[in-house]
Amino acid sequence: LDGFGKTNGRLTGMVKKFIPIAKKSSLTFTGRGGIKLHGSDMPEIMAYRLGGPYTIRGYKVNGVGTGTSFIMGSVELATPIPFVDRLKVNFLQNLRLTFWVDAGKVFDPTIASVLYDRPIQAITAGIGLKINMPGVGPLSVDYGFPLTNPGPNGSPNGYFTFGVGDMMY
């Protein structure tokens, strides 16, 4: 349990830019990064993780890798689904079709990333549905597939991810 009982510091930041397109569509750019500030070996539990619905969609949680620092970005186009507004169902007015690309890399991979032969870096693209439910917040389902080698433990055919809350918290 190397690293436990020691002081470790991390710094994480995020930049997000929304650009409205037409009446109900938007383009979102997101960039995130994190780094270990001080301390000796970072315990696995404190490592940054990439893969899953809030980081690199199209991979299982932690499927890209874990490490002491990371950088990632995402571009997402959200637009209403054609003809859904004609259904006159209130909550469906908040339903959006999304097209996105995620990319990221972890640095100084942890022992788990090495043992499980995770790819450490990934670029994915995909399509999804997002709905903003009153009282719950955004719900999303995405299907993404890797544009880079997913490694021996990843799926070259892609992966579904489900999210509750903001896509890139």
PLM regions and their residue ranges:
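C-terminal outer-membrane beta-barrel translocator/porin domains of Gram-negative envelope proteins
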Residues: 1-95, 99-100, 107-109, 154, ...
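Short basic/hydrophobic patches in alpha-helices and adjacent helix-turn junctions
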Residues: 77, 127-132
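A short pocket-lining beta-strand/turn micro-motif at the edge of beta-sheets
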Residues: 93-97, 121-125, 134-139, 158-160
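Extended, folded domain segments that form the structural surfaces/walls around functional sites
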Residues: 96, 101, 111-112, 143, ...
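Predominantly the C-terminal beta-signal and adjacent terminal strand-loop region
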Residues: 132-169
